[in-house]
């Protein structure tokens, strides 16, 4: 809305390690009119990301990956998670270029046509990261194995699943990361249309 405005008072880096935390001081308009007091918030900053649900329309199969996740471990959840291939968009790189790089690194696959699904904020109350989600056409007959970059300590299992089986994982809450859930739910809504397009 045009009357919703924010004013940055100051910004500093509060922590810099594997990731970065910024401290933002700002004011913003209020729904009942006027401006808020000056507010200070720490924001987790890790750059912008992209992810791709790899799909073989002929076989009606998706390719998912499974790896250990420190965030899930710290939250007391099962730390090996089913996910779609994803990564951080590097400087001077588009989301599409990153997706093509990551599918090779994480799954040993080359992805064909990409269909944009959604560009979402993951946790806008505390993190600046957004994720551009795509559907990517692949040949699932060539998928499977363990991949990842040793220098990044990646140990990534690549698994081919019939779409119905993958979606059942969502319904049983066995896929509990938002990007994977969004991608699979989108495909559930648009699968017939995608299979016609990619005949």
Question: Which role does the model predict for each range below?
Answer:
Residues 1-14, 23:
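Catalytic-loop region of hydrolases
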Residues 5-6, 10, 66, 77-82, ...:
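Nudix hydrolase/Nudix homology domain
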Residues 12-17, 33, 73-75, 120-132:
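Acidic pyrophosphate-coordinating catalytic loop
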Residues 14-59, 73:
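Acidic, metal-coordinating catalytic segment for phosphate/diphosphate chemistry
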Residues 21-23, 64, 133-135, 158-160:
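Conserved hydrophobic/aromatic beta-strand scaffold that supports enzyme active sites
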Residues 26-31, 123-144:
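Active-site-adjacent beta-strand/loop module that shapes the phosphate/pyrophosphate-binding cleft
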Residues 41-44, 61-101, 143, 147-152, ...:
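Conserved Nudix-box catalytic region and its N-terminal flanking loop in Nudix hydrolases
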Residues 104, 110-122, 127:
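A mid-sequence, solvent-exposed acidic-amphipathic segment
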């Amino acid at each position: 809305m045009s009357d919703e405005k924010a004013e940055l008072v100051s910004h500093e880096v509060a922590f810099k390690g594997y990731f970065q935390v910024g401290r933002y001081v700002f004011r913003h308009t209020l729904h009942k009119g006027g401006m808020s007091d000056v507010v200070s918030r720490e924001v987790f900053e890790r750059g912008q990301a992209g992810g791709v649900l790899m799909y073989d329309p002929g076989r009606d199969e998706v390719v998912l990956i499974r790896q250990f996740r420190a965030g899930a471990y710290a939250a007391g959840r099962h730390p090996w998670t089913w996910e779609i291939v994803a990564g951080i968009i590097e400087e001077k790189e588009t989301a599409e270029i990153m997706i093509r790089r990551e599918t090779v690194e994480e799954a040993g696959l080359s992805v064909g046509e990409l269909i944009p699904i959604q560009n979402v904020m993951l946790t806008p109350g505390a993190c600046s990261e957004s994720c551009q989600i795509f559907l990517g056409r692949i040949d699932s007959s060539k998928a499977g194995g363990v991949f990842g970059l040793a220098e990044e300590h990646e140990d990534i299992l690549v698994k081919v699943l019939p779409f119905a089986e993958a979606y059942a994982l969502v319904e049983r809450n066995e896929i509990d990361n938002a990007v994977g859930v969004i991608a699979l739910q989108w495909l559930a809504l648009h699968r017939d249309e995608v299979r016609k397009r990619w005949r």
